A protein has these predicted regions:
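Acidic/His-rich, metal-assisted hydrolase cores and their charged scaffolds
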Residues: 1-229
């Protein structure tokens, strides 16, 4: 069984090193307003990248969103996150006092347009601690999960109306997918040499493309299984 989420993407996915370089460039050259970065709360390595970058450029990180706060705390407790003292704080109404806006980096949930996420509340003026104003920059350090396009675009439009600048992976290399592209799928099939191959995790279109990719590296048509539950 093989994940089909990235099956329509040709070539190879970008490396985390490239993403880190793009994020560093954004943080380094950000001199006006707050920098708000939306990311998956489970992507702890991305949080570590941002911690290291912000420490390098003397920025303070604020966490927004329950799952972000909880996952970061768990990762710290287990030793998966290395955090310099004083660089990271939980977002509260008083937490940012005395810190210039351009020195604030807010890592938030809501990269998929979730209705009750922290970023969604910011875009609608309902966040208890953050009011989006002209000069703020919002970075979507994520890919849009298929099916979430409308929700994400809706939030982007609301943020722009409030005066924020929005950066996505279409503008800069601020995210690499957690799912294999076609060339990586071929490599896995060639390494494992399965007798049977079942594309999973994707609608019929994505799974069919994945099956077609498998056929190009020698899988037999009768051994490729397209199954609906």
């Amino acid at each position: 069984m093989s994940d089909s989420t990235g099956s329509v993407r040709k070539g190879f996915s970008k490396s985390e090193k490239e993403v880190g370089e793009a994020l560093e460039g954004i943080v380094k050259n950000h001199h006006k307003g707050r920098l708000i970065i939306a990311a998956f709360s489970s992507w702890i390595s991305r949080v570590q990248q941002l911690i290291d970058i912000c420490h390098k450029y003397d920025k303070t990180i604020f966490l927004s969103g329950r799952s972000m706060v909880e996952n970061v705390q768990i990762a710290k407790d287990l030793g998966y996150l290395k955090v310099k003292p004083g660089i990271m704080k939980k977002m509260t109404p008083k937490a940012t006092q005395g810190i210039p806006p351009h020195k604030q980096v807010i890592i938030t949930t809501g990269s998929q347009g979730e209705e009750f996420s922290a970023l969604s509340r910011m875009s609608e003026g309902r966040h208890p601690s953050i009011e989006i104003v002209k000069g703020d920059t919002v970075v979507f350090s994520s890919s849009i999960v298929p099916g979430n396009e409308k929700s994400v675009v809706g939030i982007i439009n609301k943020l722009i109306k409030l005066g924020a600048k929005v950066i996505t992976k279409d503008d800069r290399e601020v995210h690499t997918g957690g799912h294999a592209f076609q060339e990586e799928q071929k490599i896995m099939i060639q390494l494992i040499k399965p007798k049977y191959f079942m594309p999973v995790f994707g609608d019929l279109y994505f799974r069919t493309v994945h099956k077609d990719t498998a056929l190009t590296v020698g899988m037999k048509e009768e051994n490729c299984l397209l199954i609906d539950n």
